[in-house]
Amino acid sequence: MTRSRKKNPFVANHLLKKIKKLNTKGEKAIIKTWSRKSTIIPIMIGHTIAIHNGKEHLPVYITDRMVGHKLGEFSPTLNFGGFAKNDNKSRR
């Protein structure tokens, strides 16, 4: 079920507070977050947010083209190790 246009985008409160605090000070710092479900909003542009992928925090620089997407879209959680090689000797 998709979100309707009349609903506001979800942003975690702790993340929003940190970004507003940095914007008022005019500082740039890496913000760590576990909230992958938060939507990127225009006040986040220019900040670097370290998004947790289940193992570590991956730093992502927010640009204007990312607005409207979720933070989790920019930190992949699975590492593809490649397909298994065809090992006929072990099958015998």
From Swiss-Prot:
A single GO molecular function term of this UniProt record: structural constituent of ribosome
Subcellular location: Plastid, Chloroplast
UniProt keyword Transmembrane present: no
A cellular-component GO term for this protein: chloroplast
Keywords associated with the record: Chloroplast, Plastid, Ribonucleoprotein, Ribosomal protein, RNA-binding, rRNA-binding
Pfam family, one: Ribosomal_S19
Superkingdom classification of source: Eukaryota
Cited InterPro entries: Ribosomal_uS19, Ribosomal_uS19_bac-type, Ribosomal_uS19_CS, Ribosomal_uS19_SF
Gene Ontology BP annotations: ribosomal small subunit assembly; translation
Chief place of localization: plastid
Entry-linked NCBIfam families: rpsS_bact
Function as written in the Swiss-Prot or TrEMBL entry: Protein S19 forms a complex with S13 that binds strongly to the 16S ribosomal RNA.
Family: Belongs to the universal ribosomal protein uS19 family.
UniProt protein name: Small ribosomal subunit protein uS19c
